From Swiss-Prot:
InterPro entries: Lysozyme-like_dom_sf (IPR023346), Murein_transglycosylaseC (IPR023664), Murein_transglycosylaseC_N (IPR024570), Transglyc_AS (IPR000189), Transglycosylase_SLT_dom_1 (IPR008258). SUPFAM superfamilies: Lysozyme-like. Belongs to the transglycosylase Slt family. It comes from Salmonella typhimurium (strain LT2 / SGSC1412 / ATCC 700720). A lipid is attached at residue 17 (N-palmitoyl cysteine). Murein-degrading enzyme. May play a role in recycling of muropeptides during cell elongation and/or cell division. This is Membrane-bound lytic murein transglycosylase C. It is a lipid-anchor.
């Protein structure tokens, strides 16, 4: 669950792909303007939620959390892709079960097009799809997957009769229903993107297992993934850093649009292209492929410059130092001495996930 407790100003000179830091060695005025605008938007959005739900109940979408508000911010649907749960809640003072029923049905039947849903407003723009995103990830009370509105409605009525809960936030009563995803929900989501991953792998020469491991760690295969740093989509690509770098390398001007990065195929292509750039350009001076892979993984989160500076402020000397070490020593140093705790954990998580995909 992502509770917005504070909105930090993001430093424009840091470099990364998916975390709160950004790639790019030079000051990017356009990026700063966009980031400041995004911070203002998030602040207003969080304030609207806090006024109704209370400070401790502020819940906002994140990389592994789909959160959508409707009914003038009185109702919300939250899919926690890490925990494998769907929680639908309302603070509506009149007919709360009717609000829950409608939200449950729409959540179960929503499609997988992130461009059609604004997660930072209360507009009810969720469209019922003939191919629901959650199809196969949720089973109803009879053990059946849910594709059609009739089955979703029947299941919603069952949930309201058997699983309705309530609590007080000190201001209002919150009514909620929680639904568990199937145990292998992660694999079911991953399976949707295997073809796209395979295509990007062949195009850029990046191991499929690494792409999948990055996707799992970044978003848990949530195509709606967003972040406080405005990283977008399955591989959490930032428009004005990794996105811009990839576009420049491909001879394109400008930066990829939000809609472009919310398209799964485009997101996977861009994220994989950036992995290839890290491997073949920014960190190409590292000779051992395993050591270089550790550096690439860490750099995807915290930037290539920060990886090299762990060893030396001089990039060439840093590469030479790494080349004199065993891969195990490189891994040990990156997971214990990198200045960012997030990046230290990131290498461990991605490396572990990649091993699991290699065994399949």
């Amino acid at each position: 669950m992502k509770k917005l407790l504070a909105l930090a100003v993001i430093a424009p000179l840091l470099i990364s792909c998916s975390s709160s830091t950004k790639k790019g060695e030079t000051y990017n005025e356009a990026w700063v303007k966009d980031t400041n605008g995004f911070d203002i938007l998030m602040g207003q959005f969080a304030n609207n939620i806090e006024n109704l739900w209370g400070y401790k109940e502020v819940l906002i979408a994140g990389p592994k959390d789909y959160v959508k508000y409707t009914d003038q911010f009185q109702t919300r649907s939250h899919i926690n892709f890490d925990d494998g749960t769907i929680t639908v809640e309302t603070i509506a003072g009149t007919e709360p079960t009717a609000h829950l029923r409608r939200a449950i049905i729409k959540t179960l039947l929503m499609g997988d097009d992130p461009t059609s849903v604004d997660l930072y407003s209360d507009v009810d723009d969720i469209k019922i799809s003939k191919e629901p995103f959650l199809y196969g990830q949720v089973l109803d009370n009879t053990g059946q997957p849910i594709r059609w509105e009739g089955r979703a409605t029947t299941f919603a009525d069952y949930l309201l009769k058997t699983r309705l809960k309530s609590r007080s936030n000190g201001l209002r009563i919150i009514y909620s229903v929680t639904i568990n995803l199937v145990p292998n929900h992660l694999d079911k989501r991953a399976h949707k993107y295997i073809g796209m991953v395979r295509q990007a792998s062949r195009k850029y020469g990046v191991d499929e297992s690494l792409i999948l491991a990055i996707m799992q760690t970044e978003s848990s295969f949530n195509p709606y993934a967003v972040s406080h740093a405005d990283a977008l989509g399955l591989m959490q690509v930032v428009q004005h850093s990794a996105g811009k770098d990839v576009f420049r390398s491909q001879g394109k001007s400008g930066t990829p649009s939000r809609n472009f990065l919310f398209d799964p195929a485009s997101n996977i292509d861009t994220g994989t292209a950036y992995l290839a750039m890290l491997n073949n350009v920014y960190l190409s001076g590292i000779e051992n492929p395993t050591s270089r892979r550790y550096a690439v993984i860490t750099a995807y989160n915290g930037g290539a410059g920060s990886v090299l500076r762990v060893f030396s402020n001089d990039k060439i000397q840093a590469a030479n130092m790494i080349n004199r070490m065993s891969p195990g020593d490189v891994y040990q140093i990156l997971t214990t001495r990198h200045p960012s705790a997030e990046s230290r954990r990131y290498l461990y998580k991605v490396n572990s996930a990649q091993r699991s995909y290699r065994r399949r």
